[in-house]
Swiss-Prot record:
Protein name: Trigger factor
Location in or out of the cell: Cytoplasm
Biological process per Gene Ontology, one example term: cell division
Single annotated GO MF: ribosome binding
Family: Belongs to the FKBP-type PPIase family. Tig subfamily.
Disulfide bridge map: none
Gene: tig
Domain PPIase FKBP-type: 170-256
Alphabetically ordered keywords of this record: Cell cycle, Cell division, Chaperone, Cytoplasm, Isomerase, Rotamase
Classification via Gene3D superfamilies: 3.10.50.40, Trigger factor ribosome-binding domain (3.30.70.1050), Trigger factor, C-terminal domain (1.10.3120.10)
Domain comment as written in the entry: Consists of 3 domains; the N-terminus binds the ribosome, the middle domain has PPIase activity, while the C-terminus has intrinsic chaperone activity on its own.
Catalytic activity from the UniProt record: [protein]-peptidylproline (omega=180) = [protein]-peptidylproline (omega=0)
Length: 451
């Protein structure tokens, strides 16, 4: 197809593409379309395939020209976009739109203009000479003990307490409860049966843990509680409630002993408790290493972004917000459409939530754009040998058979993720060498990972 094109880059990573298709191509395409319709259309008074072109033009001329305009736009854009560089072609989620409906005249060149969003073009300025502070952390015996206790809890047997046992902290209570009015009658809609919680956890609406202590199975009790003005539950803040509670069941957790048998019950690969402890320590140390690496990368990226102008197109921001909404729907195990119905309208509507996420989404996108630009500018690649070495490292680190790991990464998409991650590691390794990394505050394992 013979055409002229011109791309103009505008603000907010927006582009306009003007196209002029030569009249010779317009006329040739018009003739082909007329011939096609003359063979396919059946008009009263004419045999199928024998409709004169002049009749077609008289009866369907405008419609045929409209179809031709659409075909020419589609064909030319496909060809043009394949020839443009990545900073001039549209983003996958930015569909080109016509500035105005073009008029097609068979005897003239056909011109039209479309606009769309493109990948932000960033002029790289400062990427070195920064000072970043990264916290320190280590794994203590206390951290390992805490994890062992968590495993104990997870593997505990829940057993009913003997009749007549008084409720204590850490017992598992099953209660029926309701609110009472001034006359001691049940307030409709406040009843709840078979509510289960661990005494001392505070995981109950009225925070009645201490009031349950001492009660026995089958016993009922009326509790009056006044809640502070700043209570986290706005429905209770500053109010006094009278609650009737009946303890219907009382159980306790029978924790397994921390011994070699316990370790083997967790996983047969552990011969004794010491091996389990060593594995916990190894996994925690990996978590510390990965977290510190992530904090270091984020700290440098954040400083670099401040030194650059990055114009994000609205379609890119919108796509990121919709992606987060979809992830939220997956967490709720529902569809994005159903999630929107669940939240309804008002301060917690989809629109309100997305607007609340906008600032963080834009920050994340700017970081991604800058990193991607640096990877391209520095032409960073990874070799097959580097990927193989990473397979071995991950196999040892994750305690997974090498063949099994390679099978997972035989999926092209997963292998691409791995490759991109290695490229980023190479990029940041080079960037760190040209900046100063200072040791920051010493944190505990829990403090480091709390986010």
């Amino acid at each position: 197809m013979d055409y002229e094109k011109n791309v103009t880059l505008k603000e907010k990573s927006h582009a306009e593409l003007s196209v002029k298709i030569k009249k010779s191509d317009v006329q040739e395409s018009y003739k082909k379309l007329l011939n096609k319709y003359s063979k396919e259309l059946q008009i009263p008074g004419f045999r199928k395939g024998k409709v004169p072109v002049s009749v077609l033009e008289t009866k369907y001329g405008d419609a045929i020209k409209g179809d031709l305009a659409g075909d020419l736009i589609e064909e030319s854009l496909k060809e043009i976009f394949e020839s443009l560089d990545e900073y001039e072609r549209p983003l996958p989620y930015s569909y080109p739109e016509l500035n105005e409906k073009p008029e097609l005249k068979v005897e003239e060149d056909f011109s039209f203009t479309v606009h769309y969003d493109v990948f932000p073009k960033v002029e790289i300025k400062k990427t070195e000479g920064f000072t970043i502070e990264v916290p320190e952390a280590s794994v203590s015996e206390k951290d390992i003990k805490k994890e062992l206790e968590r495993l104990q809890e997870r593997n505990a047997l829940v057993t009913a307490c003997k009749e007549g046992t008084s409720a204590e902290k850490d017992h598992i209570a099953t209660i029926d409860y309701c609110e009472l009015d001034d006359e001691g009658k049940t307030i409709s809609g406040t009843e709840r049966k078979d509510f289960v919680f661990t005494i001392g956890s505070g995981l109950n609406i009225y925070k009645i843990d201490d009031d349950i202590v001492g009660m026995k199975k089958g016993e009922s009790k009326e509790i009056t509680k006044t809640f502070p003005e700043d209570d986290s539950n706005k429905d209770l803040a500053g109010k006094t409630k009278k609650i009737k509670v009946t303890l219907t069941a009382l159980k306790y957790k029978d924790l397994p002993a921390l011994d070699d048998d316990f370790a083997q019950d967790i996983n047969e690969k552990y011969k004794n408790l010491d091996e389990l402890k060593a594995d916990i320590k190894k996994k925690f140390e990996i978590s510390v290493e990965e977290k510190i690496k992530s904090l270091q990368k984020n700290a440098l990226t954040e400083q670099m972004v401040k030194e650059h102008t990055i114009d994000l197109p609205e379609s890119m921001v919108r796509a990121e917000l919709e992606s987060r909404w979809m992830m939220m729907a997956n967490q709720f195990r529902t569809t994005p459409e159903e999630l929107e119905k669940m939240f309804g309208k008002g301060p917690q509507s989809k629109a309100a939530l997305l607007e609340g996420w906008r600032e963080d989404s834009e920050k994340t996108l700017k970081e991604r754009v800058l990193i991607e630009t640096l990877l391209k500018e520095k032409n960073i690649e990874v070799s097959d040998d580097e990927i193989e070495a990473e397979y071995v490292r991950l196999s040892e680190r994750m305690d997974i058979a090498l063949d099994e790991l390679k099978k997972y990464y035989s999926n092209p998409r997963e292998k691409e993720y791995l490759s991109e991650g290695l490229k980023e590691e190479k990029l940041f390794k080079a960037l760190y060498e040209k900046s100063t990394i200072k040791k920051g505050k010493k944190l505990t394992f829990d403090e480091l990972l709390k986010d």
